[in-house]
Each structure stands twice: as C-alpha cells, then as structure tokens.
Swiss-Prot record:
This is DNA ligase. GO terms for molecular function: DNA ligase (NAD+) activity; metal ion binding. The gene is ligA. Belongs to the NAD-dependent DNA ligase family. LigA subfamily. Its EC number is 6.5.1.2. It comes from the Bacteria. NAD(+) binds at residues 43-47, 92-93, 126, 149, 185, 301, 325. It is an enzyme of class 6 (ligase). The active site is at 128 (n6-amp-lysine intermediate). PANTHER family: CHROMOSOME TRANSMISSION FIDELITY FACTOR 18 (PTHR23389), DNA LIGASE (PTHR23389:SF9). GO terms for biological process: DNA repair; DNA replication.
C-alpha cells in the first residue's frame, strides 16, 4: 500500500506530478467502468482517488484547467437529479407588453415609495435572456453548488454539469463575500446552436427545435460528459443568499459580478424615467436580430437595493421589477398538410404541417389548429399561404390564410369521420343537457385503437400516476411497437418475461445491464401505490387528479369504489352514491360507470390487481385542530413541499385553497409571501408561520 504525503507538505511541483498521475488513473478507470463494464478497483478505492484529486485542486487552485476532471470529464451519469431548496426563492417576474404599461410601472413604484413625480428614481434596464435560469452558490469564493430554478422554491442539483461551462469560474476573483448565490441565465448562441444541430444531423441524432430548448436539455443531462460537449454560456444578473452585499445598487452588484470574473450582459443601462426605459427598450428591440443569442424582452429593476427591500414582493413576483416582453412575432409560410393525432381519450386533434420557417430564432414546422370548427371558421385549406404567430414558448398558431395567394384548386378541408389509426367511427358527442355537439371529435374504437392504447400507457406511467423512472414516452412507444407492453399489466410482468426471453432487454439498442436493472427496480418500487394515484392512472375520462382524490376519499379503498361503480346503472342507489361524491355530478358518475362496465377494462383490472396493491386512503382526522377549516399556504416552505403540505392538511380534515377569501380560516406564510399575506391582514384572517403550523398539527 502506497503511503501518501499530506497535501500540505507537497511542493507545487510534487502536487502537479501527482495531479497528472491521478488524472490518468481516474480516466482509465472511467473507461473500464463506463465503456467496458470491467472495473479493476472497488468503489471505495475509486472514491479515494477522486477525493485526493479534488483535494489537490482545492489546495493548489492553479491545477484547475479546462481539462480538469472536476470540471467536465469522468463524472458518472446520475440516476436522477437531487433536489435543492432555494434559501432565497427564485421568483418569476410580472410581465408588461406596452409602452403605456412602462409608465404605469414607474408610477406604481413611486406611489408605493411615496416619491413625487420630480423625485429622482433610477431604474436599470437589461435584455431578458431566453435561456434557463440557474443559481450558482459560492462559499469562500469557490463554486460548491449549482441548481436550476425549478418551481422557484426547489430546483435540481446540476453542479457537475455547470462545472463544464467554461465561462463560469470555479473560483471567484477578488474579495467576494464568504457566501454568495449568483443567479443568471444559461443560454446557447445562434452560431453554436446551428453547429450543434449540424453535428446532431450528421450523427443521425435528434435535431433541436431552438437554442433555449437546446440549452435547457444540455444542462439537464444526467451525464455531465454530454453537457461538456455542448457549447453553453452564462450571464449573471441577480443574487440570492449573500453573507454581505458588495454594492448598494443593482448596477453596482452586476459590476461586482464582473469583477469577480462572472460574465455579464453589456447591454445593461441605467435609466431615470419611463421615457428613458422605453427608448432603451426600442433600441434593444432594434438590435435583437443582430444579437447572437435569443432575448424575449427587457427587464426593468429599481436600482437602489434599499428601495428594492422597501418595495418587497407581490404574490410570486418582486414589486421592484418587471419584464417588458417583445410583441408576438409573425411570419407567412405554406400549409403543406393537416395531420390528425389521436389522444388517450380518443380526441382527434388537427396539426398543421408547415413549410419550415424561422420565427424569432426558432424554426417552426408545426402549428396547432385546435379542432374542426376552428379550421372551418378560419377557412384554412391545404396549399394555403398562412399567417402564423409565435409568442414566447407558446405553440405557434395559425391566424388565418392569405386569401390573395390561395391556389385555385385549394379545397375546403374535410375533417375525417373515421379514426385515421384504427378506422373506427369518429363522432362528436351530444351534450344531453344542451343538445349541442362537443367541439372535439372522438374515436369510438377505445382499446381497439392503437393510438389510444399507447397514450393510455403513457398516462399510466406518468409523473402524477405511477411515476415509473426510466419508462417515458419514447420507451413506451418502442415497447409497444416491439410487442413487449400492450396493457398496464405487461409493465409489471416485463422482468419475468425478459428472464425467459432469448432476446434480452439489455441487448437492445439504447439499453445495458445498468439501465435495465434500474428500470426493473423502478417498476418493482411501484407495486404499492396510493389509491388516488392508482385511480388517476386508469385514465378514466373526466377523472383527473382532483376527482381521483375525491373518489379515494369518498370510498377509502379501490375495491369499494369498484363495487359501487360496477353496479351504478342509471337510477340505482349506487349511481346516486357516485353522483353525490363532493365535486362529482352526472357526467363524472356516467364516465366512471362506463369505465367499470366495460368488460375489457374489468379484465385488465383483474390482472393489474394481481401485480399491484392500491393502498387505502388514510382516514381524515375529524378531531384535528384544522378539521373543517380552509387553509391557504403561501411563500416558500422550508420543511416540506407544497404538495406535501396540501396532503398533510387534507389528511387532517382541512380544505386547501389557492387564494385568500372571506371563507379562508388560516394562512400559513413562509418567506417571500406577498399579496396573499396582505389580503389575509386586510380580512383579519389568522396567519401563522410554517413552524407554528407544524406545532399546531403536532408534526
């Protein structure tokens, strides 16, 4: 066994030699492990090598380079991203869309601060980068953690991937605060995006739709080596937790970021009136097409940090900032075809196939047409030149045809009366109450229709249903195509059948022993599931998450629901029992009865219940201190997620509302609480902290 010298006793030359030797060893072990599945050292020995390598770089920062293993190579692909709670929430901005609203924003700020029209008020203006928000945490000047924005309160740990972005320093320059969270945007330039797509196409891989999606997808790769091969960039523009603020203004903070070695946007400018802001907005708008990165507006922020703190927050956005969005972009292109897609419930959805055209830096080749009435109302025909509009990340829509360019032989579009997948009749159901036809035409093929089967399987495995890691949409489509999965039952017998099969799943393209083992473990972990998620996973029409929870709460067990629903003919006591469930009605009751009355569904359920156990709904605590009360949660929760808080409150007999009203009994407020807290004070509603809530409910 080699005795290692203490790192503090090494000379720079000795450290450099050991660093190079360790790098070569780790690279070789990575190759043996990830490419040849033939490791020669134990996990503990490998980890010891990595720790020594990283300790050398910490003690001798000059060893860190673009080729450093801690920067971009050798990190194992993660099974999934760990969650990180933002100590200071990464809240979104309110949007404005006109010059008039700029004046209103400035006037609103002045009113809140009690400033007269002539009192000085400085506001910064900067381009709104169209990328992925990211938070970088530095401690002692070193990058220790990076997280995506997520929902603003909880993001994903992407530290290993962020370390591969060359513009982001691993160590800040100068005298940075002991703790500093830098917020900014990860993006991809137009030139890099085009080059990446050329490489993707040459390799026969997926072409990315736009630079933003490409940047987001690249940063969220489970394998940091993939991210390292993607040309990502970063602009710093805000901060979260900071042990001290190196400046007292927004512009000063950004200047400090630049001094620390962080990239900042050069188009940021200080303005002193609404007129200045509007002029800078239109100046940036005019330059937009010349920039090598996407922007979708201009962000205005009150410059004084002291005034920012006085202004505070409203709802999920700061009162001291707003985003002035650019108007929706339009273009004219050829409508090549109209294709019909069939969804999980049989809905036939028309999709426009367009001659590809670039709109706002994004290549658009598809657009939504909504339904057949929309096509008829706009008189859209195949072969038309059509005006399309794209606003932000919204799916492009067709505004209408350019009639003076319509071909003479263009015919009115005839919406199909049969399903294009299975050939079953496609009908528009009649509402028995109003006698009007549904706007959606649906395939009547049910489980005979392959398109519906695939979509139902996707729904079954989706996040809010069984949430099976590694069984996404693409995997389900492939497994269905290969005959491996046709019903939900097949998911839970996949491992057993694979063991007997001559063609193993691990030998298929895109799979290996590790990925297959992980998939089987993920499936096994879902053999016990809360009954409300089980009900939701079945994909019963009109039964979303809320109605699934209502059914579970009303009947307690799946067997009880099934027994009632199977006998719930029109006019029966069981139908009344279904109809009287809180939030239900005749339409939902009819849909549930239809589902359980269909013999194929009963057969699938019988097989599924041999594989899976729906766990009964916990009984509501009728004697808890919050039973029967309406509760609102607002702000950032530090001890539980919003979903966990909601589930806990409902389990204790409370009703959770999304807004504060006279019917609200209690508001639980965390950091960043805004308008809901103010509304509660206005209505004299009891408000408590998250800690007080946990004491109240005894958890």
């Amino acid at each position: 066994m080699t005795v290692q010298k203490p790192i503090e006793s090494l000379s720079p030359a000795q450290a450099k030699r050991e660093h190079r030797r360790l790098g070569e060893q780790i690279t070789e072990h990575d190759r043996l492990y990830y490419q040849e599945d033939a490791p020669r050292v134990s996990d503990a020995e490998y980890d010891a090598l990595r720790r020594r390598y990283e300790a050398l770089e910490t003690a001798f920062p000059e060893l860190v380079s673009a080729e450093s293993l801690t920067k971009k190579i050798g990190a194992a692909p993660a099974e999934k991203f760990a969650k990180i709670i933002h100590k200071v929430p990464m809240l979104s901005l309110a949007n404005i869309f006109s010059d008039e609203e700029v004046g209103e924003f400035v006037a609103r700020v002045r009113r809140f601060l009690g400033l007269g029209a002539d009192a000085p008020l400085a506001i910064s203006a900067e381009p709104k980068i169209d990328g992925l928000s990211c938070s970088l945490r530095y401690e002692g000047g070193y990058l220790v953690q990076a997280a995506t924005r997520g929902d603003g309160y909880e993001g994903e740990d992407v530290t290993a991937n962020v370390r591969t972005i060359q513009e982001i320093p691993h160590q800040l320059q100068g005298h940075a605060p002991e703790i500093l969270e830098v917020r900014g945007e990860v993006y991809m330039t137009h030139a890099d995006f085009a080059a990446l797509n050329e490489r993707q196409e040459a390799a026969g891989k997926t072409i990315f739709a736009n630079p933003r999606n490409s940047a987001a997808g690249s940063l969220r790769q489970l394998d940091p080596k993939v991210t390292a091969g993607r040309p990502l960039h970063f602009f710093a523009y805000a901060w979260g937790e900071a042990s001290e603020e190196p400046a007292d203004t927004q512009m000063g903070m950004v200047t400090a970021f630049k001094a620390f070695g962080l990239p900042v946007n050069p188009l940021m400018q200080l303005c002193h009136s609404a007129e200045d802001l509007i002029a800078h907005y239109h100046d940036i708008e005019a330059r937009r097409a010349l920039l090598d990165y996407d922007i979708d507006g201009v962000v205005y922020k009150v410059n004084s940090i002291a005034l920012q703190k006085r202004l505070g927050f409203v709802s999920r956005a700061p009162r001291w900032a707003t985003a002035h969005k650019f108007p929706a972009e339009k273009a004219v292109t050829l409508l090549r075809d109209i294709e019909i897609q069939v969804g999980r419930t049989g809905a036939l959805t028309p999709v426009a196939r367009l001659e590809p055209i670039t709109v706002g830096g994004v290549v658009v080749s598809n657009a939504t047409l909504h339904n057949e009435d929309e096509i008829a109302r706009k008189d859209i025909r195949i072969g038309d030149m059509v005006m399309i509009q794209r606003a932000g990340d919204v799916i492009p829509q067709i505004l209408g045809p350019i009639l003076d360019k319509r071909p003479q032989d263009a015919q009115p579009y005839e919406f199909p009366q049969v399903c294009p997948v299975c050939g079953s009749a496609a009908i528009r159901e009649i509402d028995p109450k109003t006698g009007t036809a549904d706007v959606v035409r649906r395939c009547t093929g049910g489980l005979v229709c392959a398109a519906q089967v695939v979509e139902r399987l996707k729904h079954f495995a989706s996040r809010n249903a069984f949430d099976i890691e590694g069984l996404g949409d693409k995997q389900i489509e492939q497994f269905y195509h290969d005959g491996l999965i046709h019903t939900p039952v097949d998911i839970f017998t996949l491992q057993e059948r694979d063991a007997r099969s001559l063609k193993k799943l691990k030998d298929r393209e895109g799979y290996g022993e590790t990925s297959v083992r992980n998939l089987f473990q993920a499936i096994e972990a879902r053999r016990h599931i809360p009954v409300n998620r089980f009900i939701y996973a079945l994909g019963i029409r009109h039964v979303g998450e809320t109605n699934a929870r209502r059914a579970a709460r009303a009947f307690g067990t799946f067997d009880a629901l099934r027994a009632v629903a199977s006998r719930a003919e029109e006019g029966s006591e069981e139908r009344s029992e279904l109809t009287n469930v809180e939030g239900f009605g005749p339409v939902v009751a009819e849909a549930i009865f239809d589902f359980f009355h269909e013999q194929h569904n009963q057969d699938v359920l019988d097989g599924l219940l041999e594989q899976v156990t729906p766990e009964p709904m916990e009984a509501v605590a009728k004697e808890s201190p919050v039973a029967g009360k309406t509760v609102v949660f607002t702000g950032a929760l530090e001890h539980m997620t919003r979903e966990e808080a909601k589930a806990q409150a409902e389990r204790l007999g409370a009703k959770v509302a999304g807004s504060v009203s006279k019917k609200t009994d209690l508001v639980v407020a965390g950091p960043g609480a805004g308008s809901k807290l103010a509304k509660a004070a206005e209505l004299n509603i009891e408000t408590i902290s998250e800690e007080d809530w946990l004491k109240l409910v005894g958890e």
